[in-house]
Amino acid sequence: MTTTPDWVQDAIFYQIFPDRFARSAHNPNDLLTFESWDSPPNPHGFKGGDLYGVAERLDYLKDLGITALYLNPILASASNHRYHTFDYYNVDPLLGGNAAFRFLLDQAHKKNMRVILDGVFNHASRGFWQFHHVLENGTGSAYKDWFFFDPERLNGKKHWGAYPGPHEQKL
């Protein structure tokens, strides 16, 4: 049985959707045209918030009494919410990449703040290279057992009753 760490008992969490929280001057805005910060959110658009922007606002969050940040997914993805991961080894460049994440962690820890990630490991984006390897190589792919396939849908299995959707992975 897993026990809850002691620090969680008194933690005050603040959930952050990085793309919509704060845009810094570090943002690599040459990668994409961002929506206006003041325009209504578009489910397929990007506002350009990044992890440097989160780090720049840690004092404000600390003043609110926040002791732990819960970040929505930050790994590389083609969607603004980043639940459709295609690279499990790298923080999305639009969020500032791995360097921005390291910077945020260092700054948060200096302020005695914890950082928790929403890790999405039970499904992947259509852009996940191992998924493409299976589509291209079928049963000859070394990754064929990583996914559930519906023989009537070569693009993958239904997700939450909707199609198309992220592809479920075997864990």
Language-model regions, residue ranges each:
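Aromatic-lined carbohydrate-binding/catalytic grooves of carbohydrate-active enzymes
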Residues: 19-25, 29-35, 60-103, 113, ...
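N-terminal basic, low-complexity leaders that serve as flexible interaction/assembly modules and, when applicable
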Residues: 2, 9-15
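Alpha-amylase-like alpha-glycosidases and glucanotransferases acting on alpha-linked glucans and related
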Residues: 4, 8, 22-23, 32-37, ...
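Short, solvent-exposed loop/helix junctions and linker helices
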Residues: 47-51, 95-98
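Short, acidic/polar
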Residues: 48-60
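Hydrophobic or amphipathic alpha-helical targeting/insertion segments
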Residues: 104-131
